[in-house]
Amino acid sequence: SPLARIQAENAISRIDYPSEIITMLEVADEDLTRPVHEMGGKGMFCTKLEKALLKNQIDCAIHSAKDCATIETEGTELLGVVYRGDPRDCVIGKHSLNQLPAGSRIGTSAPRRIEALKLIRPDCHVVEVRGNVNTRLNKINSGEVDALILGQSVIDRMGLDVPHHTISEEVILPAAGAGKVVVQV
């Protein structure tokens, strides 16, 4: 995805070691019809890269820390955070979370965000959306959803010029590892 490439390029620039980016479509990105938790959860954005590490097809993998499984894959190791961004979530759209009209359709796929939205805005409808950032943004442009919830670091890293409103950590707690990019060997 464009975001994964941006994160890899940014990580490489900080590591300052001659590198080649090898892209792979992860398991969770291949099936956009099922929720990630039905496929096995967080680690589904890292499985192919981890297999490539174990087969010595790549030297390291760059991940969004929030997508990594909580238990390391045997034979691999997370070396640490290469860089970090704003961990908070944000609402993409004309209105902040509090200002969204009743009945608004809010797109997200994270169970954490879905449950928070049910508590905070029970008068709105949560629409599960999957896909890369541009695919999700197109759902606003097409009218499929009125707003999206994305990580603020996504907006910052991609340099997106879209109306957005950052959500306080007191309103929706960020995901563990949100905004952090890690290297795995």
What are these model-predicted stretches?
Residues 2-185:
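Domain-level signature for soluble enzymes in the chorismate/prephenate branch of the shikimate pathway
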